[in-house]
From Swiss-Prot:
Pathway noted in the entry: Pyrimidine metabolism; UMP biosynthesis via de novo pathway; (S)-dihydroorotate from bicarbonate: step 2/3
Protein name: Aspartate carbamoyltransferase catalytic subunit
Pfam families found in the cross-reference section: OTCace, OTCace_N
InterPro entries for this protein: Asp/Orn_carbamoyltranf_P-bd (IPR006132), Asp/Orn_carbamoylTrfase (IPR006130), Asp/Orn_carbamoylTrfase_sf (IPR036901), Asp_carbamoyltransf (IPR002082), Asp_carbamoyltransf_Asp/Orn-bd (IPR006131)
Gene Ontology process terms (BP): 'de novo' pyrimidine nucleobase biosynthetic process; 'de novo' UMP biosynthetic process; amino acid metabolic process
Length: 307
């Protein structure tokens, strides 16, 4: 039972609780209309201190498709944060007016702080380069739907593995399922943080390999998870420009991959996946975005205790 829990980190839920969410998501996918009134009278607060299109729209569409309503802001200048109001005060006030809160904030650990002051469930919609657990729910649901389960996969993760919060969350989550292996593809400047390597992978004896070129491992992966080089995480413009075009997935590279491999991406993409790949049947990133809405519908329904 996950009613009234916060979702700050993908590890906040047990594997059994995640399966409960995925089971409901499957039911919603099969018959969305059946669930179109379950959140009538409920209000989602959306507090986005960082720009977002897909995550914010996904949350808002999810609540609206459940029959609920939305209050919130899409950037801090339109809130009292621009006047210097503390995060704790904002959360205390918003939790009076809403039943559940989705928050994105540039500071790592901000979602955890928010949960200490909220009287309603807090969903972390991204806190700096730290965690993005609802993207992880989206990713897991996509893998479960398209690859027949969450175990025994070789997962290639390519691009910005240092600052990419979706990457950190995905590795932590998929490490809980047996038989998964990771191929970590990045320039040396953007390798995974030490705590992921040591505390998640090595500590749990999970097989992984770090490489610098996509071509040398693309034929081995079942799931290729592409990420963009995130300009907003760089203080040095020259370093960003040098690394931006490090890895571009195109038709030629796709020809080296397995016929049943799937390509995922948390979006937005810049140029790391060529548009020609969109027409390949293995391109799953737009279906992944669609599944994200259903994952968030199931999550909010469970946290609110309406299902």
């Amino acid at each position: 039972m996950i009613k009234d829990k916060h979702l700050i980190d993908p590890m906040d839920f047990t594997v059994e609780e995640l399966e409960e969410i995925f089971k409901l998501a499957h039911e919603i996918i099969l018959d969305p209309e059946k669930f179109s009134h379950v959140c009538e009278g409920k209000i989602l607060g959306t507090l986005f201190y960082e720009p977002s299109t897909r995550t914010r729209f996904s949350f808002e569409a999810a609540m609206m498709r459940l029959g609920g309503k939305i209050l919130g802001f899409s950037e801090p200048n339109s809130s009292s944060a621009s006047k210097g109001e503390s995060l704790s005060d904002t959360i205390k006030m918003v939790s009076i007016y809403t039943d559940i809160i989705a928050m994105r904030h540039p500071k790592e650990g901000s979602a955890k702080v928010a949960s200490l002051y909220s009287s309603v469930p807090i969903i972390n919609a991204g806190d700096g380069g730290h965690q993005h657990p609802t993207q992880t729910l989206t990713d897991l649901l996509t893998i479960e739907m398209l690859k027949d389960g969450l175990s025994n996969h070789t997962i290639g993760i390519c691009g910005d593995l240092k600052y990419g919060r979706t990457v950190h969350s995905l590795i932590k989550a998929m490490s809980r399922y047996k038989g998964n292996k990771f191929l970590l593809i990045s320039p040396k400047e953007l390798r995974i943080p030490d705590y992921i390597r040591e505390e998640i992978l090595r500590k749990n004896n999970i097989e992984f390999l770090e490489v610098e070129t996509l071509e040398e491992v693309i034929d081995k992966v079942d799931i290729l998870y592409m990420t963009r080089i995130q300009k907003e995480r760089f203080f040095n413009e020259e370093e960003y420009l040098r690394l931006r075009d490090s890895y571009i997935l195109n038709k030629e590279k796709m020809n080296l991959a397995k016929s049943d491999m799937i390509v995922m991406h948390p979006l937005p993409r810049v140029n790391e996946i060529a548009c020609e790949v969109d027409y390949d049947k293995r391109a799953a990133y737009f279906k992944q975005a669609e599944y994200g809405m259903y994952a968030r519908m199931a999550l909010m329904a469970k946290l609110l205790g309406v299902l």
